[in-house]
């Protein structure tokens, strides 16, 4: 029996085939669209990442120090405040508040001086009592030397080649990264110090087998903690200038002292509350203030014109100052970068060989005046509450104001590496923003420096609590940003400098305009960590004037709630995430179109599901409607039947066997069994 199958194709199979083909095509199209959108968004983010890297590369190079070419308006700027220490000796001492004492792993010190003495202390930074950490810049036998102790051993780095007590002006730079240190005077060769290997760890590894197991982990942790303490300058308390407290008085000139963002001489010239001046100390020239409308410059030798690094802003507290209504905001300090390695892991990361001759450091004070226009002549003045609230004047940046400011000769907001800012062609800088940072604690930090460890981060940066407000014209309003160390995504179109505040001409008829009350809007819930934690209580007697808004790119953009404070203009806060309100991202870099991605994904999923269902239905149909074959029976044998109609001869042949069987049965019956 051989089966012969006859294939039966249903007629609807020809109709289903185009449908399946269309589903497959739709799935492929949806996946391609999704991948295209993802690719475009990834390409956009990659381009933004490259742009951010470009900006970061323009700001730090090596990583923890920001280097850029100075604009023409700053090249040849003066060295800040200058003091002369007389023969009787003097002392300028800055004291950190008890709750703001920093601990650092990287320190940078720069100062210009001219003297004729052979021995004296220029600057000394000391830690809290009983800790013993210090950094001291002094002159010994007519040569510059820096001695520091961040653990148990005094480490000295000295300029051995040339004496500096020749009465000429010299600039000295000192940089410390952990136990590594560099010292450079003018353009002379760099003196370096690198610590030797950790002998404690080596001895521990040798004796590890003999230490009981339960003591191995505590000993190892103790050694690591000891090594960590030997790289951190803990709890810095005072900065002493002049050496009169150490019986090694300095005589001569000191200019533009810079230490980790603090310009102590400028702060002393402005009468900072935390600075005390004793002895024979005299200020040379006028007091460098940020409210002076004119910029004073002094010529420098041509060999002192080189690259500059951007540093942070020091804001002095005003709670203890008397007879002052607005606080003084100190401007940024620009220091020429040195050729040392500025990375914390110098043993693992090689230094850049492009700085082989060294570059000169000049402390440069950039004076950008800021004028706080009055809000209204009929508004009574309310003094600041003692909560370290700095008064910030927010001036909206529009196309017209930028053009007016450029024509008036005010420098552009962002001048990092761009020479076109120096041209007086009146071009509009639509992408620039005005960045105003207020830190009531007076603590400063460098946003380009990543936090090195927990101790450095929480002791140095945790006290900076106030917001950083920045304006940009393409959004048509203000943006309230988080502190700089949390700012990861938003980058303006052009780099702007924190702390550089540029004066904008006051709005016309601001004094004579009538004060109009501002209706308070219900403030939504603000996410934790996004805004200032301090409660803002608006004063009922204060009348605030709203500023004219600039052109709005998005007509559907909601206006955020306003935060009102005494002597503050109406400042829109960041838009929190509230149902029913569409949040506008702060920058174009965060705008990602999701409609095409969602559509492609949905089409792909639906097409794939339809294809699977069709395949399953087809398989079930084939299983249930299997083709039944036609069988051909070929009977080539005739079987013998036991019926009575069969041939008699056959019956006779079978009879003997029947008899034999019948004969055997009686024999079986005749058997007897005995038990």
Swiss-Prot record:
Residues 621-675 are cytoplasmic. One of its GO terms (cellular component) is membrane. The chain crosses the membrane at residues 600-620. Coiled coil: none annotated. It is found in: Membrane. Processed by alpha-secretase leading to the formation of an extracellular soluble protein as well as a C-terminal membrane-embedded fragment (CTF). Proteolysis of these CTFs by gamma-secretase releases intracellular domains (ICDs) and extracellular peptides. The keyword Electron transport does not apply. Belongs to the neurexin family. This is Neurexin-3b-beta.
């Amino acid at each position: 029996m051989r089966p012969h199958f006859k294939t039966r194709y249903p007629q609807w199979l020809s109709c289903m085939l185009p449908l399946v083909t269309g589903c497959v095509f739709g799935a492929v199209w949806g996946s391609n669209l999704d991948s295209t959108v993802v690719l475009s968004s990834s390409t956009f983010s990659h381009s933004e990442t490259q742009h951010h890297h470009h900006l970061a590369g323009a700001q730090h190079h090596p990583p923890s120090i920001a280097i850029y070419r100075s604009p023409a308006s700053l090249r040849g700027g003066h060295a800040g405040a200058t003091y002369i220490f007389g023969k009787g000796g003097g002392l300028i001492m800055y004291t950190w508040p008890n709750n703001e004492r920093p601990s650092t792993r990287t320190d940078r010190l720069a100062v210009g001086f001219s003297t004729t003495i052979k021995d004296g202390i220029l600057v000394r930074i000391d830690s809290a009592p009983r800790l013993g950490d210090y950094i001291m810049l002094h002159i010994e036998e007519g040569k510059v030397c820096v001695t520091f102790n961040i653990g148990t051993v005094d480490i000295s780095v000295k300029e051995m080649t040339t004496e500096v007590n020749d009465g000429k002006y010299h600039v000295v730079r000192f940089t410390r990264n952990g136990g590594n240190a560099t010292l450079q005077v003018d353009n002379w060769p760099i003196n370096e110090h690198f610590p030797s290997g950790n002998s404690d760890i080596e001895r521990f590894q040798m004796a590890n087998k003999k230490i009981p197991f339960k003591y191995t982990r505590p000993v190892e942790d103790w050694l690591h903690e000891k090594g960590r303490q030997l790289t951190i300058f803990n709890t810095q308390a005072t900065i002493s200038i002049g050496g009169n407290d150490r019986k090694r008085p300095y005589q001569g000139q000191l200019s533009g002292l810079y230490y980790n963002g603090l310009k102590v001489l400028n702060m002393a010239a402005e009468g900072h509350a935390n600075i005390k001046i004793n002895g024979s100390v005299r200020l040379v020239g006028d007091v460098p203030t940020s409210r002076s409308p004119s910029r004073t410059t002094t010529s420098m030798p041509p060999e002192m014109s080189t690259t500059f690094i951007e540093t942070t802003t020091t804001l002095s507290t005003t709670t203890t100052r008397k007879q002052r209504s607005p606080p003084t905001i100190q401007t940024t300090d620009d220091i020429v970068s040195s050729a040392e390695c500025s990375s914390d892991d110098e043993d693992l990361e090689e230094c850049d060989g492009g700085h082989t001759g060294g570059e000169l450091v000049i402390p440069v004070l950039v004076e950008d005046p800021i004028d706080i226009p009055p809000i209204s002549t009929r508004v009574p003045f309310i003094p600041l509450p003692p909560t370290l609230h700095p008064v910030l004047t927010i001036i909206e940046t529009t196309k017209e104001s930028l053009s007016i400011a450029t024509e008036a000769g005010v420098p552009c907001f962002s001048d990092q590496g761009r020479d076109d800012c120096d041209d007086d062609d009146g071009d509009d800088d639509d992408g620039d923003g005005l960045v105003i940072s207020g830190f009531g604690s007076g603590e400063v930090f460098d946003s380009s420096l990543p936090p090195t460890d927990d101790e450095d981060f929480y002791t140095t940066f945790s006290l900076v609590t106030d917001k950083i407000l920045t304006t940009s014209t393409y959004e048509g309003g203000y943006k309230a940003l988080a502190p700089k160390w949390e700012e990861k995504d938003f980058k303006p179109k052009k780099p702007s400098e924190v702390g550089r505040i540029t004066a904008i001409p006051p709005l016309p008829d601001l004094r004579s305009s009538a004060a109009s009350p501002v209706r308070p809007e219900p403030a939504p819930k603000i996410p934790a960590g996004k805004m200032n934690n301090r409660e803002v209580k608006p004063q009922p007697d204060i009348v605030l004037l709203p500023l004219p808004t600039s052109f709005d790119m998005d007509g559907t953009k909601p206006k955020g709630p306003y935060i009102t404070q005494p002597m503050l203009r109406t400042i829109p806060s960041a838009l929190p995430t509230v149902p029913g309100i569409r949040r506008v991202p702060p920058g174009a870099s965060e705008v990602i179109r999701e409609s095409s991605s969602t559509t492609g994904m949905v089409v792909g999923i639906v097409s794939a599901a339809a294809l699977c269902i069709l395949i399953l239905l087809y398989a079930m149909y084939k299983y249930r409607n299997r083709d039944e074959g036609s069988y051909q029976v070929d009977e080539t044998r005739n079987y013998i039947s036991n019926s009575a109609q069969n041939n008699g001869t056959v019956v006779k042949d079978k009879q003997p066997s029947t008899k034999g069987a019948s004969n055997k049965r009686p024999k079986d019956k005749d058997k007897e069994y005995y038990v």
